[in-house]
A protein has these predicted regions:
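Gram-positive cell-envelope targeting signals
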Residues: 1-77, 123
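C-terminal or late-domain output modules
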Residues: 4-7, 12-15, 55, 77-78, ...
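Hydrophobic beta-strand residues in large extracellular and virion-surface proteins
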Residues: 23, 107-109, 121-125, 188-190, ...
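Solvent-exposed, acidic/flexible segments
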Residues: 50-53, 65, 87, 91, ...
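Short solvent-exposed beta->alpha transition segments
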Residues: 74-149
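Short Pro/Gly-enriched beta-strand edge/turn motifs at strand-loop
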Residues: 93-95, 165-172
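Short beta-strand edge/turn micro-motifs at domain boundaries
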Residues: 142-164, 175-221
Length: 222
C-alpha cells in the first residue's frame, strides 16, 4: 500500500514538472513582448518629437523663401525681426526684386542635434541661393552713369526717386545678368516654448541669404 502511494505521488510530480516549465516560458515571452513594445513606443515617441524642430526649421525656411516676414516672426522665440531694419529687403521699392531672387533659393536639412530632456535642438540647413554681387555692381555702375547725366541737365533726384530708380535698375539687371549661385550652411538653434518649437532668433547669416549678399545699395552710392 505504501509503495503504491509513493509511486503515485512520484508519477504526479513528473506530470506537473513540464507544466511549470511551460508556464515559465510563456511568462518570459509575454515579458519580452511587453519590453519590446515599451522600447518601440519610446523610440517612436523620441523620433516623433525629434521631427518637430526639423519641421519648424523647414517652415521657417519656406517663409524665408516666400519673404513672408510675419510667418518668420511667428516662428521666432524672440519675436524680433530688427535684424532686417537696415536691409534693403524691407523696402517696398525692392520687394518685387527680392521676391524673384529668393524664389530661387533651395535647401536641405543636413544635420540635427536633439535634446529631448531640456527641449532644445540645433538644425543645420544647407542653402543654395543667388549671390547678387554682380547684379549690384551692374546696377550701381548704370545708376552712377544716369546720375551724372541728370546732374549735367541741372536736375536732382529726391530720396524717393533715387530709391525707385535703383529698384527699376535692379529688376532690369537681374533679368540680364546670369544667375550666380552660392551655398552656405546655417545652424539654427531651436527651443520648445509653451508646447511649440521655435527658432531662437533671426541671425545675420539668414539676413545675408535673403538679401542675396547685398549690403545696402544706397550706402554704396553715398
Amino acid at each position: 500500500m505504501d509503495t503504491n502511494n509513493q509511486e503515485f505521488f512520484e508519477d504526479e510530480e513528473v506530470q506537473k514538472t513540464p507544466v511549470r516549465k511551460k508556464k515559465k516560458k510563456k511568462g518570459l515571452i509575454i515579458f519580452l513582448v511587453i519590453l519590446v513594445l515599451v522600447i518601440a513606443g519610446g523610440a517612436g515617441y523620441y523620433f516623433y518629437e525629434r521631427q518637430k524642430p526639423i519641421e519648424t526649421t523647414k517652415d521657417y525656411l519656406e517663409n524665408m523663401r516666400a519673404m513672408n516676414f510675419d510667418g518668420m516672426k511667428a516662428l521666432l522665440q524672440s519675436n524680433d525681426m530688427s535684424a532686417l531694419d537696415d536691409a534693403d529687403i524691407t523696402s517696398n521699392a525692392y520687394t518685387s526684386f527680392f521676391k524673384k531672387i529668393n524664389e530661387k533659393m533651395s535647401y536641405k536639412i543636413t544635420k540635427t542635434s536633439f535634446h529631448i530632456q531640456n527641449g532644445t535642438a540645433s538644425v543645420t540647413a544647407h542653402i543654395r541661393y543667388i549671390d547678387g554681387a554682380n547684379i549690384y555692381k551692374e546696377t550701381i555702375t548704370e545708376f552712377l552713369k544716369q546720375i551724372v547725366s541728370t546732374a549735367f541737365s541741372g536736375s536732382t533726384l529726391t530720396e524717393e526717386e533715387t530709391e525707385q530708380k535703383l529698384a527699376t535698375l535692379l529688376e532690369e539687371k537681374s533679368s540680364t545678368v546670369e544667375d550666380k549661385f552660392t551655398e552656405t550652411d546655417i545652424t539654427y538653434p531651436v527651443i520648445e516654448a509653451d508646447g511649440q518649437w521655435k527658432i531662437v532668433t533671426l541671425d545675420a547669416d539668414t539676413v545675408r541669404v535673403m538679401s542675396a549678399n547685398f549690403t545696402n545699395v544706397q550706402d554704396e552710392i553715398d
